[in-house]
């Protein structure tokens, strides 16, 4: 017992030490220890998630985009451009049967790239780079800026201020364009190469890459949502950007921002939409509080790097634009620099502009990313002084969702009937429009399908989101870039893996590259009558946008390619292949082979045995490894599957009567029989010569007494001269196996064992 300073023991007023008081203090001490341990565990989890985010940033794909590689004869091939911290890659994805890398350079960080088209007057005399084409514009990292921070370990972060022109023919750099300001995007056509900076656009001649003219724009808004796709679009003849309204233009000004669904009284759908918007806003506000708390902690252990498409580089022009110029879009002619039209597309600053292949449809998006507007550009041809008509038309309002997101990618189909919009949340939204639509009022459209690239949820997702927010990314965003493009397959090709060609194969496919480094091919087809639960699965409530997916178009995954997983990026280039896809050998290291994603029907998933019962063709083993590796635990702790109370149970699927009677009907999981997979340990013994030793008889006797659960699905593997080994890991001798009673099909009968023997087993 502890004593006071004078040597006396602490006592209660009546002279007796209170035993309950000591118990209370002990309980309080234990409670504080538990709270402290839990807090330290949370802190270690946050630090681990933050550190893993920094370490994986070096190997991940920082930027990705699909583009067209133009050949000398004018034909084009579809390529995938990947930017890494160590360099860049160019993949040929025109033929999905022969996806391979054609360029792999590792000479410095690449932020984003753009294939340069051949100029209109391409020739030996007019084209300065005639012998070096095709060309690739690479924005490099050879200039750096100091990021101001209170942290003592703040680092210099590279920013792209130079455009390096890379020749795919000679595999070398042939030209360099240097700028003083930060570069945000590069767009080109057969006439010019436009480089977007903080407050201006420099236009270069496509043949000589010499400075042609400059356009003053609105300042790039570099908030927490970043820049995204970029407020610059270059079509075959026109260039679109965000700038101040030009007073000399007689173009009409588009001022309507809120479009009513109908002129009559508000409907139930509109009321539900408004209520969902308020609910989503409240949930977002509650979530921001938790993110801010974790972000404050994670910011102490994370640097502040630039992440392409998510975090703005440097500081743009500090000049604040007037309210009238915010959200203003100006379309000019590339040749004569005249204004075609100008209109106010959004109330917020513009973050994304994109033309379709014809150059007549223009897609706009703001920094919030809630709605995407589609306009038709209609230039006036008449030179008379009569009253001019409107030079543009607002056709559609594509509703992405209520939450803020960065628009990273916009893609049109050949006929411009389909539009895919990729956001920083890892979701590709597919919209269907009618380009020939007539009318004055824009039509609100919801996504007919959404393709999610996957993100973490729960506590791990919260910690990862806070770590990403501390690194400068948007809360809830996925590191990297989501990009997509349309491809068109022939019905006679081998791209159909999951059904008959007449019913399932579609000419229109979609290639989607996810931040994880995988490219997936999806088949687009209309829903057929009578497909049952597959049609119902396409209709549901989207938790991200709060909108209901209509499910008019089925999006089925066909194949998947892993571009960077389990391979060295420095050893993937094939020296025998050319830039146009020829010469690639079958066993070339530069080629990646797809993983077939096949959707089995009910009839294919079940096979009828000789006795009339049904069972799954291939015995699938489900493991918890993929779920467990996402959790952060101490090395001294046991994994989840190794704990004493954890059990593996196998589903005994023997439902022949239901399958034969109902086909694809639902079944209750409570009615499915299960069988526990028992685990037990034994001492390691040598295999060779062990059964002939004197101790072998004792082990054999112990094996006879040990329980076994051999059934029809348990396979028996024969050991050469030493007995058999079952799936449960118990080794039996040949004499023991022959002495066991065997039924008509040659399968050993299951033996009964007592409860005492069960208690001796080790979990």
UniProtKB/Swiss-Prot annotation:
Disulfide bonds: none annotated. It is found in: Preautophagosomal structure membrane; Vacuole membrane. Residues 712-725, 741-754 have a biased composition (Basic and acidic residues). Expressed in roots, flowers and leaves. Keywords: Autophagy, Membrane, Protein transport, Repeat, Transport, Vacuole, WD repeat. One of its GO terms (cellular component) is vacuolar membrane. SUPFAM superfamilies: WD40 repeat-like (SSF50978). It is a peripheral membrane protein. Transmembrane segments: none annotated. This is Autophagy-related protein 18f. It comes from Arabidopsis thaliana.
């Amino acid at each position: 017992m502890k004593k006071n300073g004078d040597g006396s023991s602490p006592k209660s007023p009546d002279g007796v030490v209170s035993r309950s008081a000591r118990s209370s203090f002990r309980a309080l001490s234990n409670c504080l220890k538990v709270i402290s341990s839990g807090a330290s565990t949370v802190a270690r989890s946050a630090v681990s998630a933050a550190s893993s985010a920094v370490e994986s940033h070096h190997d991940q794909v920082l930027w990705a985009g699909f583009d067209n590689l133009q050949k000398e004869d004018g034909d084009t091939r579809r390529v995938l451009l990947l930017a890494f911290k160590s360099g860049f890659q160019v993949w040929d994805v025109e033929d999905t049967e022969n996806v391979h890398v054609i360029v792999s350079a590792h000479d410095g960080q690449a932020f984003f790239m753009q294939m340069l088209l051949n100029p209109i007057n391409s020739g030996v005399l007019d084209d300065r780079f005639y012998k070096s084409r095709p060309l690739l514009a690479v924005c490099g990292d050879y200039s750096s800026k100091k990021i101001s921070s209170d942290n003592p370990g703040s680092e210099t972060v590279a920013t792209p201020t130079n455009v390096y022109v890379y020749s795919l023919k000679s595999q070398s750099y042939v030209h360099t364009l240097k700028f003083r300001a930060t570069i945000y995007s590069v767009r080109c056509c057969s006439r010019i190469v436009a480089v977007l900076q903080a407050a201006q656009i420099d236009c270069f001649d496509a043949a000589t890459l010499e400075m042609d003219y400059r356009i003053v724009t609105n300042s790039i808004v570099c908030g927490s949502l970043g820049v995204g796709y970029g407020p610059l679009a270059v079509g075959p003849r026109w260039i679109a950007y965000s700038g101040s309204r030009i007073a000399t233009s007689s173009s009409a000004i588009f001022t309507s921002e809120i479009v009513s669904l109908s002129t009559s009284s508000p409907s139930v759908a509109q009321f539900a939409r408004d209520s969902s918007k308020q609910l989503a806003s409240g949930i977002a506000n509650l979530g921001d509080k938790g993110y801010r708390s974790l972000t404050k902690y994670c910011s102490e252990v994370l640097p502040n790097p630039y992440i392409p498409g998510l975090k703005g580089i440097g500081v743009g022009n500090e000049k604040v634009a007037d309210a009238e110029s915010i959200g203003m879009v100006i379309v000019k002619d590339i040749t004569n620099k005249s204004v075609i039209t100008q209109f106010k597309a959004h109330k917020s600053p513009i973050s994304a502009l994109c033309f379709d292949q014809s150059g007549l449809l223009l897609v706009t998006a703001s920094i919030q990313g809630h709605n995407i507007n589609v306009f038709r550009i209609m230039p006036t041809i008449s030179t008379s002084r009569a009253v001019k008509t409107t030079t543009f038309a607002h056709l559609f309002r594509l509703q992405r969702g209520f939450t803020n997101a960065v628009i990273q990618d916009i893609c049109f189909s050949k006929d411009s009937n389909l539009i895919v919009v990729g956001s920083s949340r890892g979701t590709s939204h597919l919209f269907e429009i009618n380009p020939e639509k007539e009318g004055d009022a824009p039509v609100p459209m919801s996504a007919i399908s959404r393709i999610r690239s996957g993100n973490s949820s729960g506590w791990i997702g919260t910690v990862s989101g806070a770590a990403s927010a501390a690194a400068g990314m948007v809360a809830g965003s996925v590191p990297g870039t989501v990009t997509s493009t349309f491809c068109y397959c022939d019905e006679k090709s081998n791209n159909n893996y999951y059904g008959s060609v007449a019913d399932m194969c579609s000419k229109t496919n979609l290639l989607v590259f996810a931040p994880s480094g995988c490219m997936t091919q999806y088949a687009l087809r209309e829903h057929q009558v009578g497909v049952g639960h597959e049609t119902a699965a396409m209709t549901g409530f989207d938790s991200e946008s709060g909108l209901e997916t209509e499910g008019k178009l089925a999006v089925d995954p066909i194949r998947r390619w892993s571009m960077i997983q389990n391979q060295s990026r420095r050893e993937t280039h094939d020296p025998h292949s050319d830039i146009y896809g020829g010469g690639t050998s079958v066993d070339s290291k530069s080629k990646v082979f797809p993983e077939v994603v096949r959707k089995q029907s009910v009839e294919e998933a079940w096979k009828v045995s000789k006795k009339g019962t049904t069972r799954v063709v291939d015995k699938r083993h489900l493991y918890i490894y993929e779920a467990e590796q996402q959790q952060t635990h101490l090395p001294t702790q046991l994994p989840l599957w190794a704990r004493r109370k954890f059990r593996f149970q196998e589903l005994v699927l023997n439902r022949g009567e239901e399958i034969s009677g109902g086909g694809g009907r639902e079944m209750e999981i409570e009615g499915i029989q299960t069988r526990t997979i028992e685990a037990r340990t034994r001492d390691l013994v040598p295999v060779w010569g062990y059964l002939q030793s004197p101790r072998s008889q004792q082990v054999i006797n112990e094996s006879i007494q040990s329980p076994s659960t051999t059934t029809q699905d348990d396979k028996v593997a024969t050991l050469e001269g030493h007995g058999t080994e079952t799936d449960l890991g118990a080794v039996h001798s040949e004499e023991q196996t022959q002495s066991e009673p065997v039924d008509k099909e040659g399968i050993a009968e299951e033996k009964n064992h007592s409860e005492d023997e069960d208690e001796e087993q080790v979990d």
